[in-house]
């Protein structure tokens, strides 16, 4: 069971591995981005698929996996991920290709990266302490869940970035290009978790 909780941390990277498509007419690339981000805020992934050129099925599938382990952790995590605000700054059609566009978006998200790092450290500390104290696995698991919930709930909506979103017109419909290739947007939508994982990996490799 403890491995399942560690899975929550390590599998978050899969959250935004987005790879299929659905058709819905939109007038301009700015409107497409607005509709896509609004759908993510509402956790309406079926609607979001209409504005995205790849597959979003990994998002609800991942959420279901987390819910199977801990409904309370899944609810808190996905509520924070969805609770971002944004402002469209600029919409630009590629002067060399009218089927390509770029939308600049200012995003404000919960800093879940800090929560993620704290959760890893707090979980390992709690696990070791309770193990040496002779605690049962059930007790350690319960405490781990409490630790995760506390760290996520304490996160603040303080992460701000302006990112460029690229789109392409497919059969007269504007759609976002593959987000997994847009590191800055991916990191924002993850609440800075992606960059935090990268930084932690570098720290670990440096100490080897």
Model-based region annotation:
Residues 27-44, 51:
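Short, aromatic-enriched amphipathic alpha-helices that serve as compact interaction elements
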Residues 1-5:
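Positively charged n-region of N-terminal signal peptides that target proteins for export
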Residues 33, 86-91, 103-105, 165-167, ...:
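Hydrophobic beta-strand residues in large extracellular and virion-surface proteins
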Residues 49-128:
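Short solvent-exposed beta->alpha transition segments
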Residues 17-20:
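C-terminal motif of bacterial Sec signal peptides marking the signal peptidase cleavage site
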Residues 6-13:
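Sec-dependent N-terminal signal peptides
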Residues 22-24:
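Bacterial signal peptide processing site
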Residues 121, 127-208:
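Low-complexity, intrinsically disordered terminal/linker segments enriched in charged
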């Amino acid at each position: 069971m403890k491995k399942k909780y560690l899975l929550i941390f390590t599998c978050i990277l899969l959250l935004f591995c987005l790879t299929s498509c659905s058709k819905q007419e939109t007038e301009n690339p700015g409107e497409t981005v607005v509709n896509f981000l609004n759908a993510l805020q509402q956790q309406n992934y079926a609607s979001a698929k209409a504005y995205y050129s790849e597959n979003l099925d990994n998002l609800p599938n991942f959420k279901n996996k987390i819910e199977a382990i801990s409904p309370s952790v899944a609810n808190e995590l996905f509520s924070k991920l969805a609770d971002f605000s944004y402002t469209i700054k600029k919409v630009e059609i590629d002067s060399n290709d009218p089927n390509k566009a770029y939308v600049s978006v200012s995003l404000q998200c919960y800093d879940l990266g800090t929560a993620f790092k704290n959760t890893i450290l707090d979980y390992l500390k709690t696990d070791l302490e309770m193990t040496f104290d002779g605690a049962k696995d059930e007790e350690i698991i319960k405490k781990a869940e409490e630790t995760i919930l506390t760290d996520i709930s304490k996160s603040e909506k303080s992460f701000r970035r302006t990112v460029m979103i690229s789109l392409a017109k497919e059969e007269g419909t504007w759609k976002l290009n593959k987000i997994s290739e847009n590191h800055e947007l991916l990191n924002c939508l993850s609440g800075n978790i992606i960059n935090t994982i990268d930084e932690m990996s570098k720290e670990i490799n440096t100490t080897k």
